[in-house]
């Protein structure tokens, strides 16, 4: 991600806000105001410069943004990162998530010097779990009552993969 393509991210997040909030905790309110988004983006780009996070956009063959994928390096273990990704509602089940995870894992282990990647999904998010398993992740543990979404507590299934 860069400042130049941050408006693509802003549009993508706004267009898919309701879809994402069905299964994920909502973003802060200021995230969807342009000035708030710009401020958050500046902070994220600083984190990226400091190698605290690696952010990538997922684009289709025509260059349209269809998703995003991030690696957030853990503060207490700089060789481990948490994987997160979002695919737009209109392009789910087309293979973008699987391919993006495959590509970012390669970068994580060969370019970024990471040794372990962890990823959490809501226990009901079977599609995301399939993407992780197809890319070599294994189930690690369950975190009960981890996320509060729509006034309900949701359990998280945690997966991990280590450098080959």
Where are these regions (language model features)?
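Conserved GNAT-fold acetyl-CoA-binding loop/helix
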Residues: 21-42
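Acyl-donor (CoA/ACP) binding surface of acyl/acetyltransferases
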Residues: 1-8, 12-22, 55-164
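Short, charged low-complexity intrinsically disordered segments located at boundaries
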Residues: 36-49, 68-75, 136
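A short helix-loop-beta-strand connector motif used in the catalytic cores of GNAT acetyltransferases and
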Residues: 29-30, 42-56
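Generic alpha-helical scaffold signal
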Residues: 3, 14, 31-38, 52
């Amino acid at each position: 991600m860069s400042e130049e393509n941050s408006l693509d991210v802003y549009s993508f997040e706004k267009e898919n806000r309701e879809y994402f909030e069905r299964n994920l905790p909502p973003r802060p309110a200021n995230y969807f105001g342009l000035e708030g988004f710009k401020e958050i983006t500046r902070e994220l780009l600083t984190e990226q410069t400091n190698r605290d996070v690696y952010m990538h956009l997922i684009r289709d063959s025509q260059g349209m943004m269809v998703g995003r994928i991030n690696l957030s390096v853990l503060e207490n273990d700089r060789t481990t990162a948490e994987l997160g990704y979002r695919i737009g509602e209109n392009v789910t089940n087309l293979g973008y998530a699987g391919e993006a995870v495959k590509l970012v894992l390669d970068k994580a282990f060969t370019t970024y010097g990471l040794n372990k990647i962890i990823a959490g999904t809501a226990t009901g998010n079977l599609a995301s779990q399939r993407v992780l398993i197809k890319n070599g992740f294994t189930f690690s543990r369950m975190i009960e009552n981890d996320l509060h979404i729509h006034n309900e507590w949701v359990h998280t299934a945690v997966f991990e993969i280590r450098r080959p």
